[in-house]
């Protein structure tokens, strides 16, 4: 069963800017989100202090961090940033 999607408010702004300025990265994110919704447990779980979250790399050095709410069958997109900033 596929999961539904929730996007953090701060990501809506980031994705809006990417849709206008960097369509290649925006399309890469869309493709990866579709894959995540089909099988979210395929992607790397993070360690403390980011436990219960997972990451997927997009366009090399950028990561998308998400959380899975199994009870509601929802994937929550939390953060998209450069690897060094996102995992601090």
Task: Walk through the language-model features, giving the residues of each.
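A short, surface-exposed loop/turn module that caps and links secondary-structure elements
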Residues: 31-57
């Amino acid at each position: 069963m596929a999961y539904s999607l929730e996007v953090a408010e701060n990501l809506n702004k980031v994705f809006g800017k990417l849709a206008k300025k960097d369509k290649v990265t925006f399309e890469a994110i869309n493709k990866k989100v579709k894959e995540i919704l089909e099988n979210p447990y395929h992607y790397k779980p993070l360690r403390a202090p980011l436990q219960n979250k997972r990451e997927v790399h997009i366009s090399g050095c950028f990561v998308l961090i998400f959380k899975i709410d199994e009870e509601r069958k929802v994937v929550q997109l939390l953060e998209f940033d450069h690897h060094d900033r996102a995992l601090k």
